[in-house]
């Protein structure tokens, strides 16, 4: 009798254990560098997260960590590669292990947001994205950080005005080489130091997308914004391949659907927000200068030396750029 009772207790305990594990949620931590009011975070919250949670009957919980709460870009990329962080949005940091991932930020590659979006939805973008799996990352979507523009305390209306301009650029050789091609004096420093450097007139200007200029308060210590649109920066929504391979196929389909919806809505929000930010900056004392055709042509022509260098350095470069141009 005792053995029967003991067996009954064991079966009951087993059923409770099975039942609780059957309904256990899988936690997906997703970290990124943008604020919680940035279009990318809003699109994650409203479309990516909700679609996955609702359509899997809350089998997954997507936890969002904006403002570098899970670490900076390099920590996110490393976490994705080794599986300690499930998902994230970063820029093109993976170009440090394979330069092809940096191609989207080559100067003057795109003329506007619509052209960039069209190319980033094309087969060549897909093909490049798939190469990330070799490094332990699955690309889910290309988002929009936006075109980089120049803010300055000097009025820049023609190419010759660039000469000697002390411009902060990221700690990245591509940006340094671009600046030198423009006859600009590049000053590499972390973003956290830029506001003070501008305030103390250590530098004359900096370059970043409109949204970052507003969110970081840089517009407060700058007078002019030159809409140079010299480099387009995407934001990549990614998931660790280790995490991805644990997700059943039927759920992977839902993740991909959510990522596609995220991509569409994030671009819509980002383009709308960029226009609002430009209006905000103009109302807060920044003069926005749209370069003349001659000025734009001078910038594009000056960048050709960079492409000559790319073509000599990378045997894939000419073919990839050709495919990008064909996708426009």
Curated annotation (Swiss-Prot):
One of its GO terms (biological process) is transmembrane transport. Residues 1-24 form the signal peptide. It comes from the Bacteria. Keywords: Periplasm, Signal, Transport. GO terms for cellular component: outer membrane-bounded periplasmic space. CDD domains: PBP2_TRAP_Siap_TeaA_like. The keyword Transmembrane helix does not apply. It is found in: Periplasm. The keyword Transport applies. PANTHER family: PTHR33376, SIALIC ACID-BINDING PERIPLASMIC PROTEIN SIAP. Belongs to the bacterial solute-binding protein 7 family. This is Uncharacterized protein HI_0052. It comes from Haemophilus influenzae (strain ATCC 51907 / DSM 11121 / KW20 / Rd). The lineage of its organism: Bacteria, Pseudomonadati, Pseudomonadota, Gammaproteobacteria, Pasteurellales.
């Amino acid at each position: 009798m005792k053995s029967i009772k003991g067996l009954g207790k064991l079966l009951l305990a087993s059923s409770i254990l099975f039942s609780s594990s059957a309904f256990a949620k899988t936690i997906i931590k997703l970290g990124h560098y943008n604020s919680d009011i940035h279009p990318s975070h809003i699109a994650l919250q409203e479309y990516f997260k909700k679609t996955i949670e609702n359509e899997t009957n809350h089998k997954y919980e997507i936890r969002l960590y904006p403002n570098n709460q899970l670490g900076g870009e390099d920590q996110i990329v490393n976490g994705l590669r080794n599986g300690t962080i499930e998902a994230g949005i970063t820029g093109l940091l993976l170009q440090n292990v394979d330069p092809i991932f940096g191609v989207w930020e080559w100067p003057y590659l795109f003329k506007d947001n619509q052209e960039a979006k069209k190319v980033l939805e094309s087969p060549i973008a897909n093909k490049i994205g798939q190469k990330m799996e070799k490094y332990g990352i699955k690309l889910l979507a290309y988002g929009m950080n936006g075109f980089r523009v120049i803010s300055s305390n000097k009025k820049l209306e023609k190419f010759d005005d660039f000469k000697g301009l002390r411009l902060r650029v990221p700690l990245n050789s591509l940006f340094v080489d671009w600046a030198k091609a423009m006859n600009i004096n590049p000053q590499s420093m972390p973003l956290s130091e830029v506001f003070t450097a501008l305030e103390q007139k250590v530098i004359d200007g900096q370059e970043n997308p409109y949204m970052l200029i507003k969110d970081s308060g840089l517009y407060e210590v700058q007078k002019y914004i030159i809409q140079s649109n010299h480099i387009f920066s995407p934001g990549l929504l990614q998931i660790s391949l280790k995490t991805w391979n644990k997700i059943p196929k039927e759920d992977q389909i839902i993740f991909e659907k959510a990522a596609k919806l995220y991509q569409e809505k994030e671009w819509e929000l980002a383009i709308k927000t960029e226009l609002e930010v430009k209006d905000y900056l103009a109302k807060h004392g920044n003069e926005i200068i749209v370069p003349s055709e001659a000025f734009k042509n001078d910038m594009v022509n000056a960048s050709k030396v960079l492409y000559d260098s790319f073509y000599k350095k990378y045997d894939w470069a000419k073919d990839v750029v050709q495919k990008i141009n064909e996708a426009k």
